[in-house]
Structures are given as C-alpha cells and as structure tokens.
C-alpha cells in the first residue's frame, strides 16, 4: 500500500522566522492604528517638507548636467504610502498615511501648493491597490517593492498632464 503524502501549506517567513502574512482578519481599525498612522504621516510630512527645501539645488544641477537622473531625487516622497501600509496592516492605511504626510508637508508652504495633496492621494491609492491585490495578507519585500513601483504610475501620469 502506497503512503499518501499530504501537501503542506507553509506561509512565507522572514529570516527571523516571523510570518510575512497576516495572522488574523485586518478589517477593523483600533485607536492605536489611527494614532500610529497619524504620527507616522506627520513625521514623514515634516521630512517631505524638508526634502522639498533641499530638492531644488540638486535638481537644478541635474537639469543642466544629466536630466534623466532627476527621478532618483523623487524617491523619498514615495515612502509614506508603503511605510504606512507595512506598519499598520489595515485597508486604507497607506492612503491615510500618504494623505496626512501630504497635508503636513503642504501646511508650512511649498512651491507646489495644494497639488501636493493631489499627489499624496494618488500615491496612497497606488500603494493601496497593490496591498488590495494581495488581499492585505502579504507584506514582504516583493509586495513592498511592487507597492513602491505602483506609487509612481498614477503620480507620473498626473504630473505629466500638468
């Protein structure tokens, strides 16, 4: 009689052995989730504002030197959606964090004005789309990288139309 082998369904694990998938339903928001995203978004918003002040010097030099490298300096603005979605693994966390960061960076004043808020909404929606595709259950490096790449699409499309 042949021995039957049962298929195993092992979930992905990090190097430390922790699960990279959600272990319980993630639909409900707790107060700590809202506060975490609010503070994280505010901190990233201050960082975004600071980056905006620093941004013009290198960009001006790159416009003269080698313009295709200008995109490398846009990376920090794409952090909030991915980080928010990874830290608070709830539907809407990436969008919430990105919008809070955009609001905070807009309030002291930027050269881009209220368009920062539109950009933040588009970036948050891009990250949310990727997390939703994976059912808010996978949060590893591949999903985070894909979410970061997806942020660029809607924002690039919108800025190109400006």
Write out the residue ranges for each language-model feature.
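Aromatic-anchored segments of alpha-helical transmembrane domains
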Residues: 41-49, 99-109, 149-159
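Hydrophobic alpha-helical transmembrane segments
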Residues: 34-39, 75, 79, 91-99, ...
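Short helix-perturbing small/polar motifs within transmembrane alpha-helices
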Residues: 18, 118-161
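Hydrophobic transmembrane alpha-helices
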Residues: 22-84
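Short, Lys/Arg-rich, polar N-terminal cytosolic tail immediately upstream
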Residues: 1-28
């Amino acid at each position: 009689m042949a021995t039957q082998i049962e298929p195993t369904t092992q979930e992905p694990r990090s190097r430390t052995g922790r699960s990279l998938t959600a272990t319980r339903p993630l639909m409900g928001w707790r107060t700590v989730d809202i506060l975490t995203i609010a503070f994280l978004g505010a901190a990233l918003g201050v960082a975004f504002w600071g980056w905006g002040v620093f941004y013009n010097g290198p960009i001006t030099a790159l416009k003269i030197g080698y313009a295709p490298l200008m995109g490398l300096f846009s990376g920090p603005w794409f952090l909030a959606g991915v980080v928010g979605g990874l830290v608070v693994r709830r539907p809407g966390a990436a969008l919430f964090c990105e919008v809070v960061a955009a609001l905070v960076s807009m309030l002291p004043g930027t050269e881009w004005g209220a368009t920062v808020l539109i950009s933040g909404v588009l970036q948050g929606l891009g990250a949310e789309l990727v997390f939703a595709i994976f059912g808010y259950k996978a949060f590893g490096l591949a999903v985070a990288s894909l979410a970061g790449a997806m942020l660029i699409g809607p924002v690039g499309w919108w800025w190109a139309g400006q």
